[in-house]
Amino acid sequence: MTNERKEVSEAPVNFGANLGLMLDLYDDFLQDPSSVPEDLQVLFSTIKNDDSIVPALKSTSSQNSDGTIKRVMRLIDNIRQYGHLKADIYPVNPPKRKHVPKLEIEDFDLDQQTLEGISAGIVSDHFADIYDNAYEAILRMEKRYKGPIAFEYTHINNNTERGWLKRRIETPYKVTLNNNEKRALFKQLAYVEGFEKYLHKNFVGAKRFSIEGVDALVPMLQRTITIAAKEGIKNIQIGMAHRGRLNVLTHVLEKPYEMMISEFMHTDPMKFLPEDGSLQLTAGWTGDVKYHLGGIKTTDSYGTMQRIALANNPSHLEIVAPVVEGRTRAAQDDTQRAGAPTTDHHKAMPIIIHGDAAYPGQGINFETMNLGNLKGYSTGGSLHIITNNRIGFTTEPIDARSTTYSTDVAKGYDVPIFHVNADDVEATIEAIDIAMEFRKEFHKDVVIDLVGYRRFGHNEMDEPSITNPVPYQNIRKHDSVEYVFGKKLVNEGVISEDEMHSFIEQVQKELRQAHDKINKADKMDNPDMEKPAELALPLQADEQSFTFDHLKEINDALLTYPDGFNILKKLNKVLEKRHEPFNKEDGLVDWAQAEQLAFATILQDGTPIRLTGQDSERGTFSHRHAVLHDEQTGETYTPLHHVPDQKATFDIHNSPLSEAAVVGFEYGYNVENKKSFNIWEAQYGDFANMSQMIFDNFLFSSRSKWGERSGLTLFLPHAYEGQGPEHSSARLERFLQLAAENNCTVVNLSSSSNYFHLLRAQAASLDSEQMRPLVVMSPKSLLRNKTVAKPIDEFTSGGFEPILTESYQADKVTKVILATGKMFIDLKEALAKNPDESVLLVAIERLYPFPEEEIEALLAQLPNLEEVSWVQEEPKNQGAWLYVYPYVKVLVADKYDLSYHGRIQRAAPAEGDGEIHKLVQNKIIENALKNN
């Protein structure tokens, strides 16, 4: 007889109120085993010949609905579902539970003798081979579910996942650490706590955001990375806030003590950077506080050569989560091939460390977890660790959340949650083991709630007893985990008392030696760094030329589909018009076609493209059609996967209805794979401000703070077209306010060919010192405007132009109008109806860096110029006016009059009524074109 058993779903184990049905099914099973589901066959086979079970089942008839077996099943079900409420997971200050479900044998009118007469198989199908009876099995369950790890998994909908977790948790298993491993674990804790104690003593009051109280985080990370190494995962991406960050840097990424202590002493830490190049640390010219900085360590300390990255992070809690997910996905994707990328979730894994107050408090966590199983964003399962010190600055849980646990919000994503006592180090290791096994099996997220405390205040200058006096009376008396575990090992005979204290002192000795080296080092005379020379210049134009035949070959390939592929007739007519620029003299390339041609040539150059956003496959305004759908079968076809001589991948995904997490993901992806042309497209530019934290704290400042380069491109539909205040403005002014030190390029274009050349220039800058973010105020109605569309000869040569003008007679021009984007096109079309040679329209295609030299050179050619006007659609306090005014004021000096035409100052971006919009828009154009 074999001991192998098939998985049993949760339902048969928890039949409870369905007991009558189960009895009927059992009778059917006795007549014909194949007449019941397979999982019930397994369960019923364990009790078929058991004299204690069958009579017990039969005794629970409709006349005795509260019979013995039903009560046993209710007890078992309660232990599984609610045992966590009585688990030993609080090192100090356990909460007082007001309402705890029945969890004891006596609560169900059961006793030892009754349970000893029932098969263990009724508790769990695999227990029949392990325990003699239900009493022994229930004792095991009580110990398991009420121990130092509290398990929550019954909320998971997937039967297979629930069954796997049930079996893994309930099967007798204990992390077996031999004496050497226990000794090593103690040493890890001694280093963790010794580091904190040394800093606390020698740098009194200095902010370090101590890990003390959740010290086990470091051995948990070390265990995770070791398991990952055994699985062949060679890229680890970690994201965390400031709490415990310095300890993780020193003991997980192996940043030398000398470097860390140097930062406290304001000396140059780079003098102690390992010469072997194994530790990569970047820095910007303005810098950041030490507990925001990350790094990358290449090491074989965990069993195989691995790349361990800790992401740079601002003080904005949790916002790094999607960045880490994006970095992980980039490490998993193979983009150096034609077609779509292939994703290997085995290449890399993300570890995201949260705070207990911030995890339920910050919505970015829910946006990020929602990405977990999506085709374009999945990373094969993230390990989430909550460093739960049960306080947020001064705020206690009762004021921080509306749920029992900070992790309750994760239940909606069908992931297992393990709460573990931070003082039981061996239990924390077991929690990691189970989590990593589950991730490997199901490629899904796991949440571990590391329940501890905070030894000191929010920072080391803070006095927590002012606001939290009672908890801190107990915390001050509570022994550290280093001491708790050390004494346990002494009692077990693993180490002696002298060995314990000797090793603690050895750690302090190593830290003193490191400190002594720094005392001899020179103070930093000038800590300021200079910007890279490449950033002194704007984005450089890509001057590569193309033959007509080359672009035609690409265009033909993009308009060729598989045999039998049925495109909607209405759409096919639109796509067929893309042949016209190549076979008609008056054929023009519109915006969407210009983009397709640019993308194709970029792919031929070997640069992968990733484009995401809400509705990006089709395009919000039904212009792109990058992914085609067979109208009969629903199958899809992506022409940009089939470009002739394609050397890199094209990846496009409709994103979930999220901005912050999706933009953070794309930023992280591009930081990890700097060769990738990452583009995020807003559904409307108005919604981009949902990602403001990513813009402010990462995209536009990361290089200045951290030396972290990104070339992420933003497509933000922007134009005033009578659609109201929430569908008109991408808040151009905010991006221009963020622009400084050549940290980005901001454009608002009026020409499809200039768009083509811009995209190529941005792609060419990637993975170079030139790379920087690109912000495109992309068009809406202009997508189909013939004035914007250009002939093919403007694509075969030339490059991006920061300003554009029409032909003009210099001596006749008395007025220059500077405008951008749709405003320029509106003015151009109005002027075409009433030509006036005295007015010269100038399209400012690139707003930042502002094209001063180009405008100055143009104005110098106009001998009779009298007036320069800036014209915009936006209100005066918005748009580009306040940004361009200082530049233009210098250019006109006292030589010309300077005027503004646009909407007056407004609190909201645009009018809500379409007719009023037209009146205001027409008035702006009329006044601007008047020649005084």
From Swiss-Prot:
Pfam families: E1_dh, OxoGdeHyase_C, Transket_pyr. Gene3D superfamilies: 3.40.50.12470, 3.40.50.970, Multifunctional 2-oxoglutarate metabolism enzyme, C-terminal domain (3.40.50.11610), TPP helical domain (1.10.287.1150). Its cofactor is thiamine diphosphate. It is an enzyme of class 1 (oxidoreductase). One of its GO terms (cellular component) is oxoglutarate dehydrogenase complex. Its EC number is 1.2.4.2. E1 component of the 2-oxoglutarate dehydrogenase (OGDH) complex which catalyzes the decarboxylation of 2-oxoglutarate, the first step in the conversion of 2-oxoglutarate to succinyl-CoA and CO(2). Keywords: Glycolysis, Oxidoreductase, Thiamine pyrophosphate. GO terms for biological process: glycolytic process; tricarboxylic acid cycle. Belongs to the alpha-ketoglutarate dehydrogenase family. It catalyses: N(6)-[(R)-lipoyl]-L-lysyl-[protein] + 2-oxoglutarate + H(+) = N(6)-[(R)-S(8)-succinyldihydrolipoyl]-L-lysyl-[protein] + CO2. Homodimer. Part of the 2-oxoglutarate dehydrogenase (OGDH) complex composed of E1 (2-oxoglutarate dehydrogenase), E2 (dihydrolipoamide succinyltransferase) and E3 (dihydrolipoamide dehydrogenase); the complex contains multiple copies of the three enzymatic components (E1, E2 and E3). GO terms for molecular function: oxoglutarate dehydrogenase (succinyl-transferring) activity; thiamine pyrophosphate binding. It comes from Staphylococcus aureus (strain JH9). This is 2-oxoglutarate dehydrogenase E1 component.
